[in-house]
C-alpha cells in the first residue's frame, strides 16, 4: 500500500507529464499548481455567487447551460421560449 507521500509523488509525476490529476486543476504543471488552480477557481465561483445572489447565479447558469457551439444561450432560450430573467444578473449593491 502506498503511503500518502508516495501517492503525492506519483500524482506530481503525472501532473508534470501533462495529466490533470486534480479536478479543476487543468493547466497546472505540478500537483501543487493544480491544487492552487482548483482552489482559486472554486473561490471565484463562490465570490460571484455572493455578488449576484443565489437566484441571479442560478439564472446565469441556466443561460450558459443552453449555449452550444452554434448558438448562444440567450438565442437558444429565445428560440425555445425558455424564460431567463436577466435582471437578476446584476450584482447586489
Swiss-Prot record:
Biased composition regions of type Basic and acidic residues, renumbered to the chain: 9-19, 38-52, 73-93
Function summary: It is thought to provide protection for the cytoplasm during the desiccation stage of embryo development.
Induction note: By abscisic acid (ABA) and osmotic stress.
Superkingdom as given in the UniProt entry: Eukaryota
Example GO biological process: response to abscisic acid
Family the UniProt entry places it in: Belongs to the small hydrophilic plant seed protein family.
Region called Disordered, residue ranges: 1-93
Protein's organism: Triticum aestivum
Note: Wheat contains at least 10 different genes for Em protein.
PANTHER family, sorted: EM PROTEIN, EM-LIKE PROTEIN GEA1
Keyword line: Stress response
Pfam family membership, one: LEA_5
This protein's name: Em protein
Membrane-spanning segments: none
